[in-house]
Amino acid sequence: MFISFEGTEGVGKTTLIRKIHQHFEEQGKQVVLTREPGGTPLAEQIRSMLLAVNHNENMSHDTELLLIYAARAQHLQQVILPALESNKIVLSDRFTDASFAYQCSGRGLSQDKLQLLNQNFVSSMPEVTFWLDAPIELGMNRARERGALDRFEQEKLSFFTKVREGYETLWKAEPERIKRLDATQSPDQVFEQALQYLA
C-alpha cells in the first residue's frame, strides 16, 4: 500500500505520518517512512538545494520543477518501488500532488509540463492521499514557531492561497483517492479521521 500526505506548510503532516506509522507497526506490518523531495542521499541533496534561501540568485520555476522530478525519479527507483514490490506499506510526506499544487497552481506553470514528467517518470501512484487542510494563516503561524523559514515557507500568503486552491482542485477531481482531513482539529482527532479511511 502506498499512502501520501499533502498540505500547505504547518498543517501537521509530520505528526500524522508518525501516528499512522506507529499504528501500522503495532499491527506487525512493515512500513517505509519517507519524504519528498528527499528519501535517498542524492534526493536529500537536491532537497537542500530546493529549500535553501539564496539571496544571490533566484531559482527559476522550471528549474525548481525539474529538480523536484530529478529527486522524485531517484526516490521512486531507490525507495518506493522496491518497498512496494516487497509488500511493504509506504508512507510518503508529499508526492506528485504537491507538484501540481505548488508548481502549477502556486507558480503558474503549465499542467502540460507536469503531465509530461508524470507520464515519463512516475510509474506508481498512491492508493490513498491524505490532504491536511487548514487556514493558511494558521499553518504559517505553526511554521514560524518551528524556527527559521525555508525558501518555500518564506513565500507570501497569496502563494499559499493558490497552493491550497490547487489541492482543493485535485480533491474535487479525485475524491476516491484524495481524502480531506480537517487540520484545525487536534492531532489525535486528525489521526482518528484518517483511520476511518484506512479501515
UniProtKB/Swiss-Prot annotation:
Keyword vocabulary terms for this entry: ATP-binding, Kinase, Nucleotide biosynthesis, Nucleotide-binding, Transferase
Reactions this protein catalyses: dTMP + ATP = dTDP + ADP
EC assignment: the record states 2.7.4.9
Q: Which residues are involved in binding ATP?
A: G7, T8, E9, G10, V11, G12, K13, T14
Q: Which InterPro entries match?
A: P-loop_NTPase, Thymidylate_kin-like_dom, Thymidylate_kinase
State the Gene Ontology BP annotations.
dTDP biosynthetic process; dTTP biosynthetic process; dUDP biosynthetic process
Q: Which Pfam families is this protein grouped with?
A: Thymidylate_kin
Q: Kindly state one GO CC term assigned in the UniProt record.
A: cytosol
- Coiled-coil spans are none
| HAMAP family (alphabetical) | Thymidylate_kinase
Q: What does this protein do?
A: Phosphorylation of dTMP to form dTDP in both de novo and salvage pathways of dTTP synthesis.
From the Swiss-Prot or TrEMBL record, give the protein name: Thymidylate kinase
Look up and give the organism this protein is from. Acinetobacter baumannii (strain AYE)
Q: What is the lineage of its organism?
A: Bacteria, Pseudomonadati, Pseudomonadota, Gammaproteobacteria, Moraxellales
